[in-house]
Amino acid sequence: MKRLLIVALFLAAANFAQAQEKIEWLKFEEAVAATEANPKMLIVDVYTDWCGWCKKMDKETFTDPAVIKYINEKFYAVKMNAEDNKREFDFKGKKYSEAKMAATMRVQSYPNFVIIDPTLQNITQLPGYRQPTEFLEGLGQIVHNGFGSK
């Protein structure tokens, strides 16, 4: 009985620890406020509800421990639905919906990852599905090319 309890506690602790390891997604305006207080780049995951490759990124790439750690350390992560016209926020004195902001960022395919520097200027886009290793390589090149906060 004691062993069973120990095994159950171990499994519960492992599941709890695993559940805590996830990307800290923010709303766009939250990420902007955060980078003003503590400068880091933003990574904006622009997706749609119908996008199968977006769901594959969520399921496979964004659950990879190395991807989670790297994004949480180097970026403020944002999820943005390119077809959401309801939720509005202010940015640089203008009102935007998520759809309007995605269009302003010139996103034309999904998934698409817009990288924004700490001064809130778009740097580049990483379009399309990427496996964890490939995704980390792309992000690493951006950070190591001097765009990241030091």
Protein language model features and the residues they cover:
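Sec-dependent N-terminal signal peptides
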Residues: 4-13
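Sec/Tat signal peptide C-region and signal peptidase I cleavage site
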Residues: 15-20
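Thiol-based oxidoreductase modules, predominantly thioredoxin-like and allied folds used
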Residues: 22-25, 64-96
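A short beta-strand-turn-helix
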Residues: 24-41, 71
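Extracellular/periplasmic catalytic domains that process cell-envelope and extracellular macromolecules
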Residues: 36-37, 69-72, 105-109
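Short active-site neighborhood of thiol/selenol oxidoreductases, capturing the structured segment around
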Residues: 38-52, 77
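Solvent-exposed loop/turn segments at secondary-structure junctions
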Residues: 48-53, 61, 82-86, 108, ...
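Non-catalytic, surface beta->alpha helical segment in thiol-disulfide oxidoreductase systems
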Residues: 60-62, 96, 100-148
